[in-house]
């Protein structure tokens, strides 16, 4: 009786995580880009969304790890679960780096850009921010790929 519950919960949590990543990349980011705000304001709004998402997403990832382990304990460990277990720390690292490093640094640069004393100083902060945003987008795509792999592995255990 516990095996199907653990497995179903495991797959649902992997799907919820993947769905959240897809929604953020394909809905939230383009919607923020369409707003008539300057980039610094957009980054500030994204930081607020990111802090809120971190609470929900962090809980989702923690439960995903617990139920992935429960799935293996209750129904046996196989290659798909071992592969998923190898990807989960990578996923946790990507998420932590994205929020802790990119999110905070982008918010700091946006705030510095808004509070700049000169146009030249603002332009310098804007260049740094755009460079960091490009790197952040690359990390987001890796996160999406790893999240898709985790979902596929969870569904095939």
Language-model features, listed with the residues they occupy:
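Polytopic transmembrane helical bundles with strong interfacial aromatic enrichment
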Residues: 1-157
């Amino acid at each position: 009786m516990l095996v199907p519950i653990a497995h179903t919960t495991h797959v649902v949590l992997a799907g919820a995580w993947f769905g959240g990543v897809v929604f953020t990349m394909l809905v939230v980011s383009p919607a923020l880009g369409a707003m008539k705000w300057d980039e610094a304001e957009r980054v500030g709004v994204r930081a607020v969304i990111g802090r809120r998402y971190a609470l929900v997403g962090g809980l989702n990832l923690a439960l995903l790890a617990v139920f992935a382990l429960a799935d293996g304990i209750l129904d046996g460990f196989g290659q798909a679960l071992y592969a998923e277990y190898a990807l989960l720390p990578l996923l946790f690292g990507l998420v932590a780096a994205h929020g802790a490093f990119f999110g905070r640094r982008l918010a700091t640069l946006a705030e510095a850009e808004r509070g700049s004393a000169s146009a030249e100083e603002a332009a310098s902060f804007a260049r740094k921010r755009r460079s960091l945003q490009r790197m952040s987008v690359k990390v987001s795509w890796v996160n999406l790929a790893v999240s898709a792999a985790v979902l596929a592995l969870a569904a095939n255990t």
